[in-house]
Amino acid sequence: MRIEDEIKNIIEKKDYDFWEFLKKAYENNIKLDIGHFILLNILIGVNDLYHKLSEKFGEEEARKILERNKIFAKNSDFISGEFLKDYIDRKSRVAVHNRIKDLKTLGFKIESKSGPFGGYKIVGYPEWFKK
């Protein structure tokens, strides 16, 4: 399993109900862009990848694998803001923060942790969202 290939597949995922997404965004006065979907794909996909790696290698080794690939922040199971920023092709982590805030407004439960060991982790989904 190549982590780079897994991440590419995660980002390319397109099996959302976009109409429902747009409707919820409209109801909440949120202007969506592809960055929202890329971030959501990564948050969900990396979480799934972490669980898959944990089953195969154990949680500690799975975390280290994702940390070595600069996906997880150091000594953490939170996805690095730097990693996310690069995938939405923006220069600042504020762009990530703003999109995460929008996803939270749409009902996604996303934990945020600041500092060098911080990042983001998805922990729950809105009723309307079918994962």
UniProtKB/Swiss-Prot annotation:
It holds the Pfam family HTH_11. This is Uncharacterized protein MJ1005.
